[in-house]
Amino acid sequence: MTNFWILMLIAITISLASQFFIKKKYGIDKSGWRYKHVSNTHKWIEITLLILFVFSLSFFPVEYLLLLFFIVIDSIRIFMEWHYRPEDKQYMYHIVEVSLMFMLLIYVCTL
């Protein structure tokens, strides 16, 4: 369990560093810490997934569920941002995050 949180911290650090690099390379303007949903439907999909995540915490291990939650949420964000706001290129941030979380999930599942 402790290894998981250490790996999660490393993944977050790598994600932040890669976001900084992507922001510089592609000139992406990411303003603020709060995420802005593409549409009202997108917002409600994420709220529904968050509610499902909270209810399923008692049935599944937190490590797997947390990683799956981030993978699903970021995958939805990739699609919505790519489909509705491709000129912003913000979906590139989420591609990096999904890749890191997927690698972390594979590592945790093999333990």
UniProtKB/Swiss-Prot annotation:
Keyword Transmembrane helix on entry: yes
Cystine connections: none
Pfam families, per the entry: DUF4181 (PF13789)
Cellular localisation: Cell membrane
GO cellular component terms given for this protein: plasma membrane
Gene name for this UniProt entry: ywrE
Transmembrane helix listed as a keyword: yes
Record keywords, A-Z: Cell membrane, Membrane, Transmembrane, Transmembrane helix
Name used for this protein in its record: Uncharacterized protein YwrE
Top-level lineage group: Bacteria
Transmembrane segments: 4-22, 49-71, 91-108
Membrane topology qualifier: Multi-pass membrane protein
